[in-house]
Amino acid sequence: DETYEGTLQSLSESVTRYRSKGYKTVFIGGQSFGANAAIAYQAAVGGVDGVIALAPGHSPYEMYQMGLNRSLIDLAKKHVTDGNAGELVEFTDLNQGQRKNFSVRADVFFSYFNPDGLGNMALSASRFKHSVPFLWVIGTQDWLIKEGSAYAFDKAPQNPQSRYIVVNANHATTPEVGADQVVDWIALVSKR
């Protein structure tokens, strides 16, 4: 029920609360779509000390190029452009082999599935507000592994503490398998 931009604003309020409580170092991260949101956050809002992307997921540009939901994305864009952002769009989402039906406002749908929007990880990485340590952890059995670091990681502003780590895992098990390396990286980055 909330646009991608609105979701990032909610995250921004959380970051502000942590800062106001005296936290000096704040990371933003997540797994799959959460990783996508962490990357988008640094592009749209910024102000965190590091970004952690575990098994990054949701690739609207690639989905659009393959024709997945293309007509619905175009319809949602038209509704938004025509001032009818509240029109409902019904679609079936495919996530890790699971199908689920949704009915959402056109502006919400388009904000998440816009091939050139915040969900486009390569574009968002290239638009980081400033250089921050960026950790990308991907499993050997994740479909995105074939794209390598050039897909989005390399597009972020360079930082000497950024790392691209490959673990022997699938999309779902990457956080568990990579947990020790993530903890070590956080400890390293937090020393600065």
Regions found by a protein language model. Name each.
Residues 2-21:
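Alpha/beta-hydrolase active-site loop
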Residues 21-32:
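Alpha/beta-hydrolase fold nucleophile elbow
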Residues 35-46:
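Short glycine-enriched nucleophile-adjacent loop
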Residues 52-62:
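Active-site nucleophile loop of the alpha/beta-hydrolase fold
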Residues 107-126:
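Active-site nucleophile elbow and catalytic-triad environment of alpha/beta-hydrolase enzymes
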Residues 128-130, 136-138:
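Short beta-strand/loop motif that positions the catalytic acidic residue
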Residues 143-149, 174:
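Conserved alpha/beta-hydrolase "acid-adjacent" motif
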Residues 169-179:
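Catalytic histidine-centered segment of alpha/beta-hydrolase-like enzymes
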